[in-house]
């Protein structure tokens, strides 16, 4: 797991356009699971384009600190059926 925010951003920059599964803390013991594509990375946040058949909205954004504090977990799904997790 990456130790700094810049390491996390660098890792996500290398996975732009890849399909992923998102697991986020929704508060009050709720866990939200969504799937989509890593669309864009910015200096402070990253944007995930969600699958439209499963979700009522198009995009979500999270900060790199959410990954560092383990509020958000990303699992990248490769074509070879292996996965890389953050």
Curated annotation (Swiss-Prot):
GO terms, biological process: regulation of DNA-templated transcription; sporulation resulting in formation of a cellular spore
One GO CC term on file: cytoplasm
Keywords: Cytoplasm, Sporulation
Outcome of gene disruption: Mutants show poor germination in the presence of L-alanine and reduced biofilm formation.
Stimuli inducing this protein: Expressed during both vegetative growth phase and sporulation.
Subcellular location(s) of the protein: Cytoplasm; Spore core
Superkingdom, taxonomy of origin: Bacteria
InterPro entries membership: Protein_Veg
Main location per the UniProt record: cytoplasm
Task performed by this protein: Stimulates biofilm formation via transcriptional activation of extracellular matrix genes. Acts by repressing SinR activity, independently of the SinI, SlrA and SlrR pathways. Could also be involved in the regulation of other genes during biofilm and spore formation.
UniProt protein name: Protein Veg
Species this chain originates from: Bacillus subtilis (strain 168)
Encoding gene (name): veg
